[in-house]
Amino acid sequence: MEDSHSSIWEHRQAELWDRIFQVIQDVVTLADSLEDDAGGVIVKQEMVKTAMAVGTHLVRANAAEEPGDFDRHLTEARMKAIETDYWLRLAYVLQQKEEVQRDLSSIITQYAGIVDLLHKFIRHTRTEKNVINRHTKGPRIQ
């Protein structure tokens, strides 16, 4: 049973990496299409910065040698995902173009899924022994 449980979490971790890379690409592409008017520059910069920080903290978690560092970086990745969601929602309010709002809405939905997955992953890592030894696989390069 433990092997299948571990396998499920390895699959979820791989899913998380795939989703993070895709949504970061979507955020960067979207940011390039936003206007640089009142406050727009700051919103774009912060949106991209926090989106990329999610991946950065996941990489740091995977490189952690101590369970405390692993947990801290996973938690920080989740907080950065929540912060990115804030910037995306702010951009949605500031943007008047329907097509941009549609794209933002899609990305916001993706971030809700990522925040949920990170929350489940954090809960999993806090309840299982030796989790750091099994979940330091990093992103898959294809």
Predicted segments with their positions:
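Short, C-terminally biased terminal segments at protein or domain edges
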Residues: 1-56, 64-142
